Amino acid sequence: METLVFNETKIDVNEEGYLKNPSQWTPELAHELAREANITLTDKHFEVLNWLRAKHAEGVALSIRKVGNSGIVDIKQFYGLFPGGPLKISSKIAGIPKPVSCI
């Protein structure tokens, strides 16, 4: 098992850096994960991240289309917020597992 140390706390991650335990996620950790992806988080980013976390907790299989239909952002905005693989990157920053729909 791999670990990430953040604020003197060990965080369990998988080989791709996704949190194994979403309850270890904090907004501060999200900022750090976003920095690693060269993203500066805004309130709009957190709206998306919180929506992703809520849907994951409900057991919803996430997809780019579902995010685009969320009412928070459309697909173009989603790509703008998380360039280079929006669902994959946003899920990692949100502290949830990589969605099955991501390669």
Task: Give residue ranges: language-model regions.
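Metallocofactor- and cofactor-centric catalytic cores in central/energy metabolism, strongly enriched
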Residues: K20, A30-G59, I64-K66, P83, ...
